[in-house]
Amino acid sequence: MNLYSKLKEREAKGSPIRIGLIGAGKFATMYLAQVPKTPGIRLARIADLAPDKARENLRRVGLDPAQFAISDDWEKLVADPQIDIVIEATGNPVAAVEHILAAFRHRKHVVNVTVEADAFCGPLLAQKAAEAGVVYSLAYGVQPALICDLVDWARAAGFPVVAAGRGHKWLPHFAQSTPETVWGYYGLTPEQARLGGLNPKMFNSFLDGSKPAIETTAVCNATGLTPAPGGLLYPPGSVEDIPSLMRPREEGGVLHHKGQVEVISSLTAEGVQIPYDIRFGVFVVFEGETDYIRRCFSEYGVKTDPSGRYACMYKRWHLIGLEAGISVAAVGLRGEPTGCATGWRADAVAVAKRDLREKEILDGEGGYTVAGRLVPAEVSLGENLLPLGLAHGWKLLRPVAAGQPLSWSDVAFDANAAAVKLRREMETSVAPGSDRSQYGQPQQASAPARRATAARSP
C-alpha cells in the first residue's frame, strides 16, 4: 500500500529501478505508456525481433525512440549490469523460457508476462529463481496475478478461500474454433479484423478455452487452489450469481471441492449475454465460518449466497500492461512477486480439436489442431500428457482422435530444446501436489541484490 511513496523516494535519491523489456507488442506498449508517468522507474533497453516495430510502438505512446537502446539482441539486454528487472513479454513460451533462464544466470529479477511458459514449467522456474537469489513473478495486469492478489487479500484477512478464478465468454462448441471461424463468434467480419490489425490465432486462443486453461494452471500452482478432476466447468452467471455458484455441490453450487479454481461464463447455455457479467474480470469467493462473521456480512450489505455463508470480492476488468508497474514496484522495492508458483498442482495439456492424422504438424494454442484443457498435475504426469505450451511445430507420430489429450509419445519432440529440458526436469524433480512456499521469495538470498539495486545511480 506504500509502493507509490517508495517509488518517489527512489526518484528523489536518483536510484530508479531499471527495466529491460523483451518483446514490444501490445502488452509491452501498454506498459510503456505508463513508464513516463511513474516515478522511480527507468526503461533501459528494449529487445524485439522487429526493432522498427518497437520504435513505432514507442512513438504511438508519445515516446522518442532515440532516447532508448533498442535492438533485436535479447542476450545483450539480460547481460546489461545496469538492468534490475527483465520483463518477458514475447508471448512465445519456448523463447520465454530461454530468456528467463538467461536472466536468472545474470542475477536479474523477472516479471513474466508469457503465462504460457509459466503454465508448463512455472514451479521449476520459481525454484531456479530462488537458487539464483532473484525474484520471479507473474505480471500484474494479466488475470492470474490479479487472482493471486485477491486470494492473498482474503487469506491475509483471515477468510478461507472457497474458489477463485476469472470470467470468460464460453460455450462448449467454442473448443473447436479455428482462426478461420473465430471472427464470427466475436461479431466481426474477416475484413474488419484485418483493418483492426487483430491476430486471429491469438484471439482464438482465448475463445477456444486455451487461455483460460493456461491462466488457471498458473493460479493453481501459485495459490494452492486445485482444479476439479474433469477440468474447468464454465458455469454461466452474473457477478451477483458468483457466491451461489461457487459453493460445494452438496450446498447448491457447482464446486467439486472447496479451494477450487474456476471460470464463469458470460453466456447462458443458449448463448444469451448475461447482464453484469465477469467476462473481463476476476473474483475470489470466501467463507464466513461463524455466525458472527455471517451477521457482519448481512449488516454491511455484503452480497452472499442464500445461506449468508459465502461472499465474493471481484474486479470486473483488468488493465493488461497498463497496470504491470505494480509487479515492477513489488519486485524492485519489496523483493516480492505478484504471483509465483509455490508447487505443482495443475497443468494445461493439449487436446485434439478434431481427428488428427499421423505426420500432421501441431500449431499450438489458438490454432487448427489443439486446444488447452486444465487437469490436475498428477493426472498430467501419470498419463504422460503433452503440455499445451510445447504443442507447436512438432510432427504427430500417430493419429489422435478428436477430444483426446495428446501424450509425449504421440509427437516427435526436440529433446534438446531448453524449454523441453526444463519441463522434463520438472517432471522428474517436482512432485505433483507439492507445496514449496519459498519458491519465488528468496528474501535472504536476494537482499544483497536489492541493496546493490538501491545503490545504483541513473
Give the location of each predicted region:
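N-terminal Rossmann-like dinucleotide-binding module
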Residues: 1-61, 216
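C-terminal catalytic/substrate-binding lobe primarily of soluble NAD(P)-dependent oxidoreductases
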Residues: 2-8, 185, 189-445
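Short, ordered loop/turn segments at secondary-structure junctions
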Residues: 49, 91, 115-118, 141-142, ...
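Conserved N-terminal Rossmann-fold NAD(P) cofactor-binding segment
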Residues: 50-80
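Beta-loop-alpha module in the N-terminal Rossmann-like domain of NAD(P)-dependent dehydrogenases
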Residues: 72-105, 116-122
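Rossmann-fold NAD(P)-binding glycine/threonine-rich loop
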Residues: 95-102, 115-135, 139-142, 152
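A short hydrophobic/small-residue beta-strand
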Residues: 109-111
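Rossmann-like NAD(P)H-binding beta-loop-alpha module
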Residues: 137-207
